[in-house]
Amino acid sequence: MLNKIVEVKHLSHKYSVDWAIRDINFAIKENGVFGLLGSNGAGKSTTMNIICNVLTQTEGDVFINGINLRERPIEAKKFIGFLPQKAPLHTEMTVDEYLYHCADIRLMPKKEIPEAMERAKAKCGITHFSKRQIRNLSGGYQQRVG
């Protein structure tokens, strides 16, 4: 049985007097695919901002890999990332330069960075683009770098 990597329970958020989302419940299993769909103003961005800890919920709980995001945000955020449709990349960098930069600003120990970069590139299918400038990759491969 696969673990729940993200679990949302009774999630609600209120902007002053209006509820943006109310009593949202869902779970995403490890290696799962999940679509958050809805019309404009349905609360998709609010929900994602709460899951990414950009916004604090009014009610309910978010668990990342079993860790309560509200109670232990630093530990929980180690297990999640968010990639917007248009990734904010430094396109003048090579893939390796960018991945090193990202690991460095996340304060990963320098001796662990090269191995982590290789794992990430292999997992995303971009190993053969290591020395290529990001601007010279297709949109799909740029998303993988992000």
Language model features with spans:
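ABC transporter nucleotide-binding domains
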Residues: N3-V6, H13-G146
